[in-house]
């Protein structure tokens, strides 16, 4: 049973005799007979990204702090079928349409 379940429930008392009435637990709230009401949590749970950033390993060693990103060799040139091309024709409209298709503006 969680702590919020214990404090969020009302306390049942038996008021059969005047002797028991003096030992009743005073009710809190606006007189509606509610027990203690939990309004908000003082330590809310972090969302997943905030938790990941908070709990990830920290760089504490000088060699790790000063470490640079890995330098990779440059990629080879693209094959001919992946290269952009232009149409060499007298019709300016067809060349413009082909240029739009290659650039992805269409």
Curated annotation (Swiss-Prot):
Q: Which UniProt keywords apply?
A: Chloroplast, Plastid, Ribonucleoprotein, Ribosomal protein, Transit peptide
A single Gene Ontology CC term: chloroplast
- The keyword Transcription belongs to this UniProt entry's keyword annotation: no
Q: Where is this region: Disordered?
A: 42-70
Annotated GO biological processes are: translation
Record field: compositional bias (Basic residues): 44-59
Q: Where is the transit peptide?
A: 1-39
Could you name the domain of life of the organism this protein comes from?
Eukaryota
Chloroplast listed as a keyword: yes
- InterPro entries given in the database record: Ribosomal_cL38 (IPR020526)
- Which GO MF terms are attached to this record? mRNA binding; rRNA binding; structural constituent of ribosome
Localization terms from the record:
Plastid, Chloroplast
Oligomer status and interactors? Part of the 50S ribosomal subunit.
Question: Which family is this protein grouped under?
Answer: Belongs to the chloroplast-specific ribosomal protein cL38 family.
Q: What is this protein called?
A: Large ribosomal subunit protein cL38
UniProt source species: Arabidopsis thaliana (Mouse-ear cress)
Q: Name the encoding gene, please.
A: PSRP6
């Amino acid at each position: 049973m969680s702590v919020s379940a214990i404090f969020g429930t009302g306390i049942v008392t038996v008021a059969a005799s005047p002797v028991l009435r003096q030992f009743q637990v005073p009710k809190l709230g606006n007189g509606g007979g509610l027990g203690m009401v939990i309004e908000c949590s003082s330590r809310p749970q972090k969302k997943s990204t905030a938790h990941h950033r908070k709990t990830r390993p920290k760089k504490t060693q000088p060699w790790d702090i000063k470490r640079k990103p890995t330098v990779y060799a440059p990629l080879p040139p693209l094959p001919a079928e992946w290269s952009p091309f232009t149409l060499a024709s007298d019709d300016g409209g067809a060349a413009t349409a082909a240029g739009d298709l290659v650039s992805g503006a269409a």
